[in-house]
């Protein structure tokens, strides 16, 4: 599929007179977005077959809203990434199913997540280096803003507990996964 996408982009771009660097960037973005789309749809379909369509949809949408900006956990292949996403989504759905959070718990967990994201995001992965200072700052602002928006959504939808709790657990788990790649400065 990767070769097909690269060839298709090269074919479409040959009349646009793009330089090699821009063409590579376009290819990278299209390939990543295509694989991410397939992964997300697959996870939602599997969860839907098991009766958790709406929960998995909220998990995936919440992840898409914050994950690109906070960094953190990455796998080294599409299959491993799919399996990890499926396990994370299933775990969040189980947490929502078996643990009921009150308003105080939701506020505390979300504030903890936002505080951690503010202090650690974006976590830079060596395979996906973000080296330009202005991009790092932009991602930090977007990660804090988006996690704060998710927190507000949990408060607005508190009476619809499965939405509020699904977003809260997703934000918390994604925040915990930030520390998977965090390296202490003295190590």
From Swiss-Prot:
UniProt protein name: Putative AgrB-like protein 1
Recorded topology in the membrane: Multi-pass membrane protein
InterPro entries: AgrB
Major place of residence: membrane
SMART domains: AgrB
Spans traversing the lipid bilayer: 29-49, 50-70, 81-98, 103-120, 149-169
EC number(s) on file: 3.4.-.-
Family statement: Belongs to the AgrB family.
UniProt subcellular location: Cell membrane
Record keywords: Cell membrane, Hydrolase, Membrane, Protease, Quorum sensing, Transmembrane, Transmembrane helix
Function: May be involved in the proteolytic processing of a quorum sensing system signal molecule precursor.
């Amino acid at each position: 599929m990767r070769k097909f996408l690269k060839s298709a982009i090269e074919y479409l771009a040959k009349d646009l007179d793009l330089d090699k660097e821009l063409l590579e960037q376009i290819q990278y973005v299209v390939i990543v977005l295509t694989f991410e789309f397939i992964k997300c749809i697959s996870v939602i379909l599997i969860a839907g077959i098991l009766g958790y369509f709406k929960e998995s949809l909220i998990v995936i949408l919440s992840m898409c809203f914050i994950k690109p900006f906070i960094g953190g956990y990455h796998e080294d292949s599409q299959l491993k990434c799919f399996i990890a996403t499926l396990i994370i989504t299933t775990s969040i759905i189980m947490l929502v199913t078996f643990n009921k959070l009150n308003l105080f718990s939701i506020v505390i967990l979300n504030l903890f997540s936002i505080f951690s994201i503010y202090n650690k995001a974006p976590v830079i992965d060596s395979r996906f280096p973000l080296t330009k200072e202005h991009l790092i700052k932009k991602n930090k602002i977007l990660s804090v803003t988006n996690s704060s928006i998710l927190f507000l959504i949990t408060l607005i939808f508190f009476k619809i507990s499965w939405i509020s709790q699904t977003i809260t657990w997703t934000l918390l788990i994604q925040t915990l996964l930030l520390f998977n790649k965090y390296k202490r400065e003295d190590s």
